[in-house]
């Protein structure tokens, strides 16, 4: 494993998506439904949607549902929770597989299927049969956190670690980084690691260095 891949693995493990570390904001009802799904109860079909960064993939991954390595899993006897992410990008073959999975779940009342995408059901470029089945259950638009909510949560998590985020650092993050919590918390994780390793308090230069390290590991820009 390369050094960059090991770094990304460590970063993923520190920030593995769970319901507990999802910041609900105005999505409290969705989190409640997902807690029910995790217990094997609640609606049989759920569709959630929103732009990249609002938490659709985070929520789906947090369910720890059955996966068989396929773009759309096959129904398997004994497995009761299935997820399909990015339904917007399904090609015709996988869309047909989703329709088959939808029908199988419908025939098994104990089973649950949760799908995610970027657009509301009506705007999806999918066969009508798939779209109508996505509408069998509940549909939620995942609302992004506003700037005040994002930085209030960032400050709360920083305080829990004994970190002080100065107004200067907040202003820099607000103007230079994507506005999703996953990115902000990953930068905080890395900056905290650097500060601890060097026995220094967190400063703006360390914050910038943390972003540079993440970008180098990702092979692209985090900004």
Question: What positions do the PLM features span?
Answer:
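Conserved AAA+ ATPase "SRH/arginine-finger" region at the nucleotide-binding site
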Residues: 122, 137-149
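Short regulatory helix/loop adjacent to the ATP-binding pocket of P-loop NTPases
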Residues: 121-135
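Conserved AAA+ ATPase "sensor/coupling" helix adjacent to the nucleotide-binding pocket
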Residues: 133, 137, 151-164
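A short, basic N-terminal segment
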Residues: 1-36, 196-223
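Walker A/P-loop nucleotide-binding motif
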Residues: 42-59
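The conserved phosphate-sensing helix
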Residues: 177-191
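Conserved P-loop NTPase "ATPase switch" module shared by AAA+ and STAND
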Residues: 72-97, 101-104, 112-119
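Short conserved motifs of the RecA-like P-loop NTPase core
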Residues: 164-177
């Amino acid at each position: 494993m390369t050094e960059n891949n090991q770094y990304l693995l460590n970063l993923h493990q520190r920030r593995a998506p769970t319901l507990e570390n999802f910041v609900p904001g105005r999505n409290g009802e969705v989190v409640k439904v997902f807690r029910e799904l995790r217990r094997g109860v609640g609606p049989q079909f759920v569709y959630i949607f929103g732009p990249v960064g609002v938490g659709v993939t985070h929520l789906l991954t947090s369910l720890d549902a059955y996966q068989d390595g396929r773009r759309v899993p096959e129904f398997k006897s004994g497995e009761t929770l299935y997820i399909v992410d990015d339904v917007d990008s399904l090609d015709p073959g996988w869309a047909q597989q989703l329709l088959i999975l939808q029908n199988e779940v419908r025939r098994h009342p104990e089973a649950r299927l949760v799908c995610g995408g970027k657009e509301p059901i009506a705007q999806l470029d999918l066969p009508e049969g798939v779209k109508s089945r996505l509408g069998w259950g509940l549909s939620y638009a995942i609302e992004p956190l506003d700037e005040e909510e994002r930085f209030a949560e960032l400050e709360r998590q920083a305080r829990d670690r004994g970190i002080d985020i100065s107004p200067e650092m907040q202003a820099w993050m607000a103007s230079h980084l994507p506005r999703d919590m996953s990115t902000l918390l990953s930068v905080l994780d890395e900056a905290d690691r650097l500060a601890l390793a060097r026995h220094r308090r967190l400063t703006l230069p360390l914050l910038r260095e943390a972003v540079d390290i993440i970008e180098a590991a990702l092979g692209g820009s985090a900004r």
